[in-house]
């Protein structure tokens, strides 16, 4: 019994060792010595798993019975289990401690919780509760495991009796198996002895047969020979059989639907299946339950042959009779129908092989896959392949099958790699001809190609208007009669046909015309697209040559396509056969316009050529899927020709094309973004009849912008929809000084705004507000061909942010002074004598590659981030906390932000003015006496270096309102007169009170206005305390407290470290809850004040 736990200390009786235990009953004496978990003394060779011993002679001389084998396999000491459980508990406890240490527990909220039942609830944050639950679950689990160990310990004290029971059970099982094996062997022996038995010879029967030649004991069956059947009798019997068959078929047998056509004659029934076979069956008994028997079969399709006599005929005869016996007429039909279908497929296969070896050599490919015949035609033709498949098709729901659920031969036509309907293919299942089938398929294929080409040509304006004519002759059975005739000019015609066997296109025209354009055509193309391209090219030659001569007069330069590294032909549609490129000196080199001519119309195109450096930077050379140029048709007529008679045609056309290049770049960018609605769409972007450049109307909604283009605002600044959702982007010419296109975005504000025009600086030309209205205009500059959409969205969102800040300042009754897209200046203070500037800094505009629409849509992180800053000029006292206020503006918490900054300015103004007054040293003759370290806007450290005193000034909630608390911090070194200063501080501050402040015994609490009195009183306690050796000490103190963190004991007594100070500010003031207030160090202008943010 594996897994038995033995406790060595308690296996035997109490007080006895296991190996010295003696038997206490007669059984043990009869079986010899009793051993536990081992051999007896003096036994050296024993099995560690099973131990047995031969019997020893007893006193009376007889051998004793053998010892029962003792089982020790699977036993292990109980101490091992205890040790492993303890080790596992220790390991899991270590893992639990590591896991709990990784869970960050948020500190207590600054709002104190009321005690419940006289006990403090403690920290009830989710993280802390989770930690407690994990500890409790671990304790419960380990408690249950050790309870199990206790139960096992109690059970192991009785393990000796269980071990005896195991040994006894093993002995009984061994004896039982021995009895079973003995019975099995006896049975096998008895079975083998049967083969050894030999019957006794029957000598009497053998003697009678040898002597008389017969055996009298055998019975005579009394068979009589039949009479000869006469002609009349045979006819009578045949009529009787006909009646029996007719009655049976009409009343009893289930006839399948294909066997409904039959006739009864000559003692047999003939079933006729049209196009397949005739089957003759007869009966062998009058009973209606007897089976039909096969007589003969004849095939009704050609080519076919009778079944040859011999082995094949016998096998088919036996197989049909078996089907009639087992499945009746239905099983017989299914067997013969499948046999016929398979035979037809093999006949067609042989015919296809003969064709592939004859006239259709190298143009056919034949494969037989099980019962599916595949014939591929036009094998030498490049491109998608075409083939037909002939196989057995299920007849379920098929009207063409011979009956419901009856399979039949089916065709599957794959034309140019795509499956098409095969109902028009001429295929006779009764007269099998693979050549006729192929001719029908190829004729339908050729008819499809020529009719498609005819349809394309008929849609062109030249043919639909009747200027040119075309007609097609089609045939569904004979491919040689299919042809297409096209009128090229008034006197020239072209006839197109396709060779049936190879699929090659044959063009028949006048020799001169054919030689001229066969050289331009590709030899690999064999579809009707070649014909359309060649016919279209004829008309395009004269149109382009005339256009080039007219445009050169207007001053454009012709660009040769061979000098471009880009394949310019890929830009235009396939029907454009002739084109010419032009460039203007005012444009960038990567932009050209193209005049194209096709069989449908003449067009001006704007084409952007990608530079080779762009390709090398963004895309690999081997990537052929990336377009190297792009273009758009912007007119349906040649504008140069229509304006060539005007003297000002060149400036008008140059302005028009320059505007189209600039507008097209922006519309194309909007089209690639997909999420922004605009008008007109890219496909409808056209030059108007008077050469006016169309404007772009954009629906501006921040929620519809891609994630990467949405401006990320600080958490404290709420996004407001202050602009109407329609913005008009217009082209306003070219700035020749900057060689850039000028765009103006016109929009309207949601509500009325006053005095916006007065706040805009006259030197800022990028933003203009309408006088007395809600309209505004943004001026944008970009090189011609570079989109300004990202710049537009950034400016619009920045404008909304600027207006939101302006609206907030007015709600707080602060006085705005100036306004732009980069800053807002305002005045604050009791007399509005102080000014501050909120700066709006945007992240750097990414490169052109990063602003690609595909990359913009794929990005999940924003590209545009707004960072607010605040700037104070000298002598504004708040300049010392400028960095901390800027961090609050950009804090990740929703509680921080502009609202919080305005409160900070109001709350800290008295303090900052008092510190500014004390630390100012205009003459620079008085030595430094006070060092101020600004941790953040709500935490200050005041250090009197000479006297050796350090104070911490922080905010606390006192009597339900935010107050200033001044506490003295321990100093590593005491200065001269330390006790006198200490007594002066107690009398003046700690045990006193004044206007707006009150002593606390070990500190001072003051409101926002009274803190200035506290600072002045504190400074008065140290006024005049100077020392001649203060400079070295100040240098050492400045190094200790300005560049190094406070010691650990000081952090516990009231001088926390930089990170701890930020956390303490968060808990007490409930305004700032992150360490981000400790960034961007800003040093004040006074040399005796150090600011650490």
UniProtKB/Swiss-Prot annotation:
It comes from Aspergillus fumigatus (strain ATCC MYA-4609 / CBS 101355 / FGSC A1100 / Af293). One of its GO terms (cellular component) is core mediator complex. Keywords: Activator, Nucleus, Transcription, Transcription regulation. Residues 19-31, 1040-1056 have a biased composition (Polar residues). One of its GO terms (molecular function) is transcription coregulator activity. Residues 41-62 have a biased composition (Basic and acidic residues). This is Mediator of RNA polymerase II transcription subunit 14. Residues 1-62, 1034-1065 are annotated as: Disordered. The lineage of its organism: Eukaryota, Fungi, Dikarya, Ascomycota, Pezizomycotina. Belongs to the Mediator complex subunit 14 family. GO terms for biological process: regulation of transcription by RNA polymerase II. Component of the Mediator complex. InterPro entries: Med14_N, Mediator_Med14.
